Structure formats: C-alpha cells, structure tokens
C-alpha cells in the first residue's frame, strides 16, 4: 500500500518527515484526505456559507485526484460558528431511516461492550474507567429506548459534521462533513457547551423542528458518542486517553445537570421519558 508520504512526494513534490493530514509546507497550509461521498458537494457547501474553504491542489499531472486522495490548501478565514449550525439545520431533499440509526447505535454499544470487557480485565486500568463504562452503557441504552418513541420511519437530513468543534479547520474540513439527520450538529453543539439551553430552544423554534425531531434530539443528547469512540478506536491504556477519561469522570455531575436542563426544556414541546437515575 502506498503511504500518504509517498503520494505527496510522487504527485506533488512535497517532502515531509512524518505523516499528518493537516500540515504546512513552504509557508502554506495543506490538508490531505481520501475522496469521500461529500467531495463533489464540498465547493457548493463552502460557497453557500460565503467562504473560500479548502481549495483543491492539482497534482503534477494537472489532475485533482491522486490514487483516491485529494490535496487541499487553505487559509484561516474569519467566520461565525452560528452560520455553520444554522446551515446544518436546513432540510435537504433527503431522509434518513430511524431504523438504521437504531441499528447503528446498537452495533456501537455491542462493539464497545466487547472492547470494554477486554480493558476491564487489565490490572493497569483504573476504577474510573469501570464507572464510566457502566454509566455510558446505561446512557446508550436509554438513548435507544427514547429513539423507540419516534413514530415516523424517516427523519429529514442536513449537512452535518462528524465532529462539531468551534475551529475553522474542523468546521471546513472536507472529510468532516456528512449527510445525516439535521439534528446531529445541534445536539453536538449543546453537548460540547458551544450553545446554551436558551440558544438550543431558539434553534428549535427557528427551525420548526417536528415532535419526532425533538425526540431524536433528546436521544442524541443522551447517546455517549465520544466515550464509545474512545472505547472502540483508542488504546485506553494510553496516558493521554486516560487523562481524557479522567476528565470525563470528573465531569459526570455537570453532564447529568446539563441533560436534566435540556430534558426540562424539551419536555415543554412533547412528553419525553425521564431517566430516573440522572
């Protein structure tokens, strides 16, 4: 398999010492990623936001794609986080199936449970990880239970982010965009403390979310994507990961309070099941 370093050398005459998706070379910022389902739509997306975004660099053969990879260059632009969130709530003429969301979440919980079982058997793991695993497994199961309250079989889609972070490089990253339920970015923004509960309610009203979308919003707030991603994809024995897990453990009470506040607000729009142990 050809490495990213070899692709950069062979097709762009860029020479780096180590692989990195984001990098600088001769005073310019670059990003290298594989072609994805959103590649063709990306220019229209950033144009709609009034930004230049990431721009394609043609290779030495004057072609945009090099062995299924695309190289972009970019400059940090002034932006407002709210414009990304507002755009994510614009409905597309596409729908996502609720059943597929449920199946995906069940698969994530099952895989994480398996990995957590392996980690928990290691003496080197500290007790915080065990507490977190029980807590987040419970949240995940509660989220799926709430998901079952949705009556429609499909939800309206929007242009969302895999990781919703208030950072230009992540918000405009061509590989960080996905067609998903238009609720995804809204839920992530609240969970990541990027918006307050008052702002969350304003977006609900402005976007005229349906009852089913509000139910799904609550289930997304409950589902512990960040912890499950760590449990599945990362080595939880790693010192940096342990530090992240410890921070999660220390923040559990704040997270519970945030979920209760959101539940109280959302419950004004539709009756939502209360999680007794929150």
Region annotations inferred by a language model:
Residues 1-18, 33-40:
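Short Lys/Arg-enriched alpha/beta "domain-start" segment
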Residues 216-223:
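Central hydrophobic cores of alpha-helical transmembrane segments
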Residues 168-215:
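Active-site Asp-x-Gly
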Residues 155-175:
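Conserved catalytic-loop position in the HRD/HxD motif
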Residues 27-99:
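ATP-binding pocket architecture of kinase catalytic cores
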Residues 10, 14-21, 97-160, 202, ...:
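ATP-dependent phospho-/nucleotidyl transfer catalytic cores
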């Amino acid at each position: 398999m050809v490495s990213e370093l070899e692709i950069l050398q062979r097709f762009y005459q860029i020479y780096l010492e180590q692989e990195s998706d984001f990098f600088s070379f001769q005073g310019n910022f670059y990003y290298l990623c594989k072609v994805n389902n959103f590649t063709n739509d990306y220019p229209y997306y950033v144009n709609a936001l009034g930004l230049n975004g990431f721009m394609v660099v043609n290779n030495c053969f004057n072609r945009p794609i090099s062995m299924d990879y695309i190289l972009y260059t970019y400059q940090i632009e002034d932006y407002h986080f709210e414009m990304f969130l507002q755009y994510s709530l614009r409905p597309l003429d596409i729908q996502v199936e609720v059943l597929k969301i449920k199946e995906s979440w069940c698969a994530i919980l099952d895989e994480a449970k398996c990995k957590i079982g392996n980690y928990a058997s290691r003496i080197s793991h500290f007790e915080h990880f065990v507490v977190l695993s029980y807590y987040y497994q419970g949240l995940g199961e509660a989220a799926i239970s709430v998901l079952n309250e949705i009556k429609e079989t499909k939800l309206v889609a929007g242009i969302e982010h895999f990781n919703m972070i208030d950072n230009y490089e992540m918000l405009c990253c061509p590989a960080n965009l996905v067609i998903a339920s238009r609720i995804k970015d809204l839920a992530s923004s609240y969970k990541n403390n990027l918006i307050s509960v008052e702002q969350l309610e304003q977006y609900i009203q402005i976007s005229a979310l349906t009852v089913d979308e509000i139910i799904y919003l609550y289930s997304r707030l409950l589902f512990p994507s960040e912890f499950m991603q760590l449990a599945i994809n990362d080595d939880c024995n790693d010192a940096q990961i342990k530090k992240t897990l410890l921070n999660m453990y220390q923040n559990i009470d704040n997270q519970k309070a945030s979920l209760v506040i959101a539940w109280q607000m959302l419950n004004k729009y539709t009756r939502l099941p209360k999680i007794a142990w929150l």
